[in-house]
UniProtKB/Swiss-Prot annotation:
Protein name: SPARC
Keyword terms, alphabetized: Basement membrane, Calcium, Copper, Disulfide bond, Extracellular matrix, Glycoprotein, Metal-binding, Secreted, Signal
Gene name as annotated: SPARC
Role according to the record: Appears to regulate cell growth through interactions with the extracellular matrix and cytokines. Binds calcium and copper, several types of collagen, albumin, thrombospondin, PDGF and cell membranes. There are two calcium binding sites; an acidic domain that binds 5 to 8 Ca(2+) with a low affinity and an EF-hand loop that binds a Ca(2+) ion with a high affinity.
Species of the source: Gallus gallus (Chicken)
All copies of domain Kazal-like, residue ranges: 84-146
């Protein structure tokens, strides 16, 4: 999860912007973890009741909550039925936490703005089993807005920036990975070779002509980043194919800033089966067939 949090911070900062222009169910972008310090960490901290009069020890029997370890997908919450068994039911959208920030809002494929991803998934859950619910997905982060059509010339430029951005994200993770465990040892070894290559094009707002020349000149530097990104997305399940749901963590933050995102991913699905295989993904980024290797998805 730490990798994805950092991943989206990179998305918000760089946004794959071109020189002429300024990150199952879709995954929520931010996970908030809080940890309560143990009693005794502060020298003056005492347990409640430390100075109370001694009383007879009585063993307290605490009933285990059946929902405690029962996981429900986004849009559902756990409830206990008449047999004290946990079950997942649709969450009431009105029970979602109130959000006021514009970046908390999300846009659905129904072109409707939802107050938060919680409100979106709760609404989607209530539509389960319907045609509308089947077609409804989280489209992008932020309120709905006009997304201009992607021209053919713009579509050819998109993978140039995306490829370069993937390479730079990996290099940044590598440089900041001393204690964060953002990359595995195998991944670090692959990125190290790219990082130490003096011919590497440094991060920056480059023209598409320069990006195209660099890809041709330093083609081998881009092979692993493309495979790595596929592996980051192929998670639910890990089956060698990317569904609309699995693409969401990458698509959702990009669409408001890169209007060719949707058309690009649609074009990657060469056989129109609603899934993008590794071969289709790599081909979309210009990786040659002989260089597509499942063992690089690590």
């Amino acid at each position: 999860m730490r990798t994805w949090i950092f991943f989206f911070l990179c998305l918000a900062g760089k946004a794959l912007a071109a020189p002429q222009e300024a990150l199952a169910d879709e995954t929520e972008v931010i996970e908030d973890l809080t940890t309560e310090g143990p009693v005794g960490a502060n020298p003056v901290q005492v347990e409640v009741g430390e100075f109370e009069e001694p009383t007879e020890d009585v063993e307290e029997i605490v009933a285990e909550n059946p929902c405690q370890n029962h996981h429900c997908k986004h849009g559902k919450v756990c409830e206990v039925d008449d047999n004290n068994s946990p079950m997942c039911v649709c969450q009431d959208p009105s029970s979602c936490p109130a959000h006021s920030g514009v970046f908390e809002k999300v846009c659905g494929t129904d072109n409707k703005t939802y107050d938060s991803s919680c409100h979106f998934f709760a609404t989607k859950c209530t539509l389960e089993g319907t045609k509308k619910g089947h077609k409804l997905h989280l489209d992008y982060i932020g309120p709905c807005k006009f997304i201009p059509a992607c021209l053919d010339t713009e579509l050819t430029e998109f993978p140039l920036r995306m490829r370069d951005w993937l390479k730079n994200v990996l290099i940044t993770l590598y440089e900041r990975d001393e204690d964060n465990n953002l990359l595995t040892e195998k991944q670090k070894l692959k990125v190290k070779n790219i990082h130490e290559n003096e011919k590497r094009l440094e991060a920056g707002d480059h023209t598409v002509e320069l990006l195209a020349r660099d890809f041709e000149k330093n083609y081998n530097m881009y092979i692993f980043p493309v495979h790595w990104q596929f592996g980051q997305l192929d998670q639910h399940p890990i089956d060698g194919y990317l569904s609309h749901t699995e693409l969401a963590p990458l698509r959702a933050p990009l669409i408001p800033m890169e209007h060719c995102t949707t058309r690009f991913f649609e074009a990657c699905d060469l056989d129109f089966d609603k899934y993008i295989a590794l071969e289709e993904w790599a081909s979309c980024f210009g990786i040659k067939e002989q260089d597509i290797d499942k063992d690089l998805v690590i």
